[in-house]
Amino acid sequence: MWDWRVKVHIDYREKYIKEYFEKNRDFENIVETKNLEIGDIIIYINEKPTILIERKTVKDLASSITDGRLREQKFRISASSIPKEKIIYLIEGELDEKLYGRVDKKTLQGSLINTMIRDDYKVYRTKDPKESVYFLVRLINKIRNDKSKLIKIENVKEEDKIR
């Protein structure tokens, strides 16, 4: 059996998410608030940064497309040690027909498609902050409790296999 320690760092600017985890005792020894240089949430397994989550509201996505922040953030994330397949863009809110500044629905969808296809990152959509927290709780608990289902067989050394 192998050792499995999970830690989660949440950027201090993620107010709603931070407040939820600060109030929930189930996560008091797992979740810490930090000033993160990249991403909004980083999940560590055995002290190794393993999953990076960049959370954006639809409005923030639109403004980061317009001012170039999205491209710059993706560049910094791609330079990190976290594998592409473990990077998640958590997009919060509805993509409706209204304009977000100069950005329309077609542009927003195009950006999300590029994120998935060109950049090889995962995109997960939620309707609001409450659903985002629900997703994060499920993700963290899945990692904590179902580790044998999350490890790819080819990545497990013979001596680490469960007997």
Regions found by a protein language model. Name each.
Residues 5-27:
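Short, charged N-terminal beta->alpha structural module
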Residues 2-7, 30-163:
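Extended, alpha-helix-rich binding/interface surfaces that flank or overlap catalytic cores
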